[in-house]
UniProtKB/Swiss-Prot annotation:
This is Small ribosomal subunit protein uS15. The keyword Transferase does not apply. The gene is rpsO. It comes from Paramagnetospirillum magneticum (strain ATCC 700264 / AMB-1). The lineage of its organism: Bacteria, Pseudomonadati, Pseudomonadota, Alphaproteobacteria, Rhodospirillales. NCBIfam families: S15_bact (TIGR00952). One of its GO terms (cellular component) is cytosolic small ribosomal subunit.
Length: 89
């Protein structure tokens, strides 16, 4: 259900803006998106797991706020990120 440390490192390498970057908005959104995908798969088979559903909604809101921040600060980075992650449009 949770993502492994190896998968997290792969995401950090893929979405980092520079060497050693683990906290940029792009990396955080990518990790959140992976966790959201995993939790969505879990909820497809465990429909009554409402505690996990609440966690999912919290993560989606957190990702939304992070994307809003990125859009306000640098629209080009925002557009590139949602394109790479396959989020909306």
């Amino acid at each position: 259900m949770s993502i492994t440390a190896e998968r997290t490192q792969e995401l950090v390498k893929e979405y980092a803006t520079k060497e050693g970057d683990t906290g940029s908005a792009e990396v955080q959104v990518a990790i959140l998106s992976e966790r959201i995908r995993n939790l969505t798969e879990h909820l497809k088979s465990h429909k009554k797991d409402f505690h996990s559903r609440r966690g999912l909604l919290i993560m989606v809101g957190q990702r939304r706020r992070m994307l809003d921040y990125l859009k306000a600060k640098d629209n080009k980075r925002y557009e590139g990120l949602i394109g790479r992650l396959g989020l909306r449009k």
